[in-house]
Structures are given as structure tokens and as C-alpha cells.
């Protein structure tokens, strides 16, 4: 397997985007941790904590939906279409997350604490996927007989 394999990296990113929000939502950690992200307001009322949980769940389900799209691209498309759709999906994902976090920060959103080594995976896999898809933008499908 070559390093710049669009199918592999799209499946890796799609799995990352699908599995982790699902685990966080099902385990209850999304709801339990949500008020801490708005710590700049001090202690939240029950209603405010519920609203914070809804924001976190919606954000997580948005990531999950993008993960399913990325998995679909990885499984159903062939190069160069897969590479081109992969670039669009990865750029779209990055822009949506930057806009979401940036907009929420204007309203006092503090975000998650430092994630340590896990942050390398969360940032590295999509970044490698973007680079791989960009490198393979004009690739040709090789038919072996």
C-alpha cells in the first residue's frame, strides 16, 4: 500500500469523525462536560446547562454526519473523483469547524481543554487526508488485467 492512498486516508478520517462523536454522545460525556466549556460565565443554571449540552450534541452530530459523507466518498468514488471530493470534504470540514469555534468563542465558548497526544491524531489524520487527496487530484485509475 502506498502512503498517499486516498481510500485509506478518507476511511481513516471518516472513521475518526464518526466513531468519536458517537462514543461521546452515547457515553454521556458530551452532556456532562458541556457546562465546563462555558466556564467564563461562572456557574450555569439548569436551563443554561441544558442549552450548552444541546450545542455540544449538535456540534458532535454535525461532525458525525460529515464523517459519514467522508466514508461514503472513500468507499464509493474512484480516483481522481475520490481525491477531488476528498479535498472538498476536508476543506469543508476544516472551514466549518473554524467558523463554528470562532463564532462560539465570541459568545464565551471556551472549548475543550488541551487534548495532548490525542490532538495530534484529531488534527493530523484529517490534515494527512487533505494532503493525500490534493496530491492525487489528477491521478489516473490504473486498470490491471
Name each region found by the language model.
Residues 15-60:
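Hydrophobic transmembrane helix segments
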Residues 99-119, 136:
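Membrane-helix boundary connector in multi-pass membrane proteins
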Residues 68-91:
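Juxtamembrane helix-break-helix junctions at the cytosolic face
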Residues 17, 61-71, 125:
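Core segments of transmembrane alpha-helices
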Residues 86-104, 122-128:
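Hydrophobic alpha-helical membrane segments
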Amino acid at each position: 500500500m502506498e502512503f498517499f492512498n486516498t481510500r485509506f486516508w478518507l476511511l481513516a478520517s471518516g472513521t475518526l469523525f464518526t466513531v468519536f462523536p458517537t462514543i461521546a454522545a452515547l457515553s454521556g460525556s458530551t452532556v456532562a462536560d458541556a457546562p465546563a466549556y462555558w466556564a467564563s460565565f461562572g456557574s450555569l443554571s439548569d436551563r443554561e446547562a441544558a442549552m450548552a449540552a444541546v450545542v455540544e450534541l449538535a456540534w458532535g452530530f454535525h461532525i458525525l454526519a460529515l464523517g459519514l459523507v467522508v466514508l461514503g466518498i472513500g468507499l464509493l468514488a474512484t480516483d481522481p473523483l475520490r481525491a477531488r471530493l476528498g479535498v472538498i470534504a476536508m476543506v469543508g470540514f476544516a472551514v466549518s469547524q473554524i467558523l463554528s469555534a470562532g463564532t462560539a468563542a465570541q459568545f464565551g465558548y471556551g472549548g475543550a481543554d488541551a487534548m495532548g497526544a490525542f490532538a495530534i491524531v484529531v488534527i493530523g489524520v484529517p490534515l494527512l487526508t487533505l494532503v493525500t487527496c490534493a496530491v492525487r487530484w489528477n491521478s489516473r485509475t490504473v486498470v490491471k488485467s
